[in-house]
A protein has these predicted regions:
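Catalytic donor/gating beta->alpha subdomain of glycosyltransferases that bind UDP-sugars
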Residues: 211-273
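Glycine-rich, basic loop-to-helix element that forms the pyrophosphate-binding segment
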Residues: 100-116, 137, 190
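Short, acidic, metal-binding catalytic loop of nucleotide-sugar glycosyltransferases
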Residues: 61-71
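A conserved acidic beta->alpha catalytic loop
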Residues: 62, 78-86, 125-129
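Cell-envelope/extracellular polymer assembly enzymes that use nucleotide-activated donors
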Residues: 41-44, 73, 221
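Short, flexible, basic/aromatic active-site loop/helix in glycosyltransferases
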Residues: 152-158, 167-196, 205, 263, ...
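Conserved donor NDP-sugar-binding/catalytic core segment of glycosyltransferases
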Residues: 129-164, 168, 239, 243
């Protein structure tokens, strides 16, 4: 059965995007409403959420302030929130709340695909605040690049000490490596990862949507498939801010689960592995080896150098980064090793 049939899309619908020309994909800076020809693609905005009462109002206010003129629906796909997320979302006109019984983000995004009436699906998370021209720039980048998916950088916007420390770790070279999507100053280019972003609904459906076997890293798994379908385009003008986790414990749990998901992706697609992704699991193994003391001292020296750079810009965040970086690396590394073992039986025999 094809992905389109599985997701229940109307096969008679002809996406507007197919009628638009696909210019040179090396164009580095599409502008909103810049020389568009033909009808504008209809857009569905999808928010897969779970217990985001503290952030959903700001998120939806930003979504409802978009400059793009053809947003046909805003779907809040709720995974059974135990707080007031659903009630808050229901108070916004033009917002439709739909159920995600499986609770997972991958399942919630597939619910959005089945419900979508738009030609383009723009994903927004509950902890994210998008710029007013976010959708406009997503559609412009999709049209001009011809990519299967486009997105921009991640920009942490913490207010508490922990949130700022986590944000500093996320955007540092030690935390992010050379990843383009964590650098707001990076130039537009083809890439293997972006933050959230937008994709053509017909392409997503043809690929079968999100893999619901993934409880985390569902976006990374899909991005790998999309990179072979039409490519992933990074545009630094697609701007949004993200509220980091508010405690080191929840941050560590988040990255432990990310590590599990990344390992499952590598098991499924070995070619998706990047050398930098081995650093954290090798660190964990090194700390368990007979050379643990030397490994620990070398690692702490590297962290100290990275923290020193941040201290010159933000003393409080830099000090917190000394906790956030090891928390990030160790939890992700342990998660990767656990995920590697867990996913062995799922993919090794295929």
């Amino acid at each position: 059965m094809s992905g389109t049939a599985r997701l229940g899309r109307n096969s008679a619908q002809t996406p507007v995007l197919r009628s638009l020309p696909v210019p040179d994909p090396t164009h580095a800076g599409p502008q909103p409403n810049e020389n568009r020809t033909g009808p504008l693609p209809a857009v569905t905005i999808a928010l897969p959420v779970l217990d985001e009462a503290a952030h959903i109002e700001a998120c939806l206010r930003a979504v409802l302030s978009q400059t793009y003129p053809r947003i046909v629906e805003i779907l809040v796909v709720d995974g059974g929130s135990g707080d007031a997320t659903r009630e808050i979302a229901s108070t916004f006109p033009g917002v439709r709340v739909v159920d995600n019984p499986a609770r997972l983000q991958s399942a919630g995004l597939n619910v959005a695909l089945r419900e979508a009436r738009g030609d383009v699906l723009v994903r927004v998370d509950g902890r994210t605040t998008v710029a007013p021209d976010y959708v406009d720039r997503c559609v412009s980048a999709l049209t001009r690049s011809g990519a299967a998916l486009v997105g921009g950088p991640i920009e942490p916007d913490g207010t508490t000490w922990v949130e700022r420390a986590v944000g500093a770790a996320l955007t540092s070279k030690l935390g992010a490596g050379p990843a383009r999507f964590r650098n707001t100053a990076a130039s537009a280019d083809w890439t293997d990862i972006v933050y959230l972003g937008a994709a053509r609904v017909d392409v997503l459906c043809r690929l079968g949507g999100y893999d619901e076997a993934f409880s985390t890293n569902e976006d990374g798994e899909l991005l790998y498939r999309l990179s072979r379908e039409g490519g992933v385009w990074f545009d630094p003008t697609i701007r949004s801010t993200y509220r980091p986790r508010g405690s080191f414990a929840t941050f560590m749990r988040q990255y432990f689960l990310y590590g599990i998901g990344r390992a499952a992706t590598v098991r499924k697609y070995p070619a998706s592995l990047r050398p930098r992704q081995l650093a954290a699991p090798l660190l964990v193994l090194g700390l368990l080896s007979p050379w643990r003391r030397k490994v620990a001292l070398a690692y702490l020296a590297v962290v100290a150098a990275g923290v020193g750079t941040e201290l010159r810009e933000d003393r409080a965040a830099g000090a917190g980064m000394a906790i956030a970086l090891p928390a990030m690396h160790l939890s992700w590394g342990v998660g990767f090793l656990v995920g590697w073992l867990r996913s062995r039986s799922r993919y090794d025999d295929k």
